[in-house]
Regions:
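Conserved structural motif at the start of ABC-family nucleotide-binding domains
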Residues: 3-5, 18-20
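Pre-Walker A (P-loop) beta-loop-beta motif of ABC nucleotide-binding domains
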Residues: 21-32
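The feature captures the beta-strand-to-loop junction immediately N-terminal to the Walker
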Residues: 34-36
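Helix-to-loop junction immediately C-terminal to a conserved catalytic motif
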Residues: 49
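Conserved ABC transporter NBD signature motif
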Residues: 57-72
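Conserved ABC ATPase "signature" region
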Residues: 107-123
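Conserved ABC ATPase signature
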Residues: 125-132
Length: 132
């Protein structure tokens, strides 16, 4: 299942923010988007996430068009620009709340991934006390 971005363009207040962008994102791969400040990175991600409509072009996932066959991409999780957690909760509590959105991640999986990244899932330390 690939994600196809085909010839999308977007203007805001007469200024072209996205200009004829096309790309195929292959399933199972990780991508990064980089560019200068104001180059349209966030706008592109917002378009892919279905948060905005584009002026031209289309976005398709699994041969279904965004905003035509579906409102948002299925199973999409996106944090665009500001990453934040609930500072008054522990790391495990934060991840547990996020996992409850779809209900597809078990407590055991949260424990395993926290241990993998060197975090103690049983710690009561609040995330605002974590070092970055």
């Amino acid at each position: 299942m690939n994600l196809y971005v085909k010839s999308i363009s977007k203007s805001i207040k007469g200024e072209k923010v996205l200009d004829d962008i096309s790309y195929t994102f292959e399933s199972g791969k990780i991508y990064g988007i980089y560019g200068k400040n104001g180059s349209g990175k966030t706008m592109l991600l917002r378009a892919i996430a279905g948060f905005i409509n584009t002026d031209k072009g289309y976005i398709k996932y699994n041969h279904k068009a965004l905003h035509k066959d579906m409102d948002v991409l299925p199973d999409l999780g996106a944090v665009i620009e500001n990453i934040s957690f609930w500072s008054m909760y522990s790391g495990f509590e934060n991840l547990k709340m996020l996992s409850n959105i779809k209900g597809i991640v078990s407590d055991e999986e949260i424990y395993e991934i926290m241990i993998y990244f060197g975090l103690d899932p049983k710690s009561k330390k609040k995330v605002n006390k974590y070092s970055l």
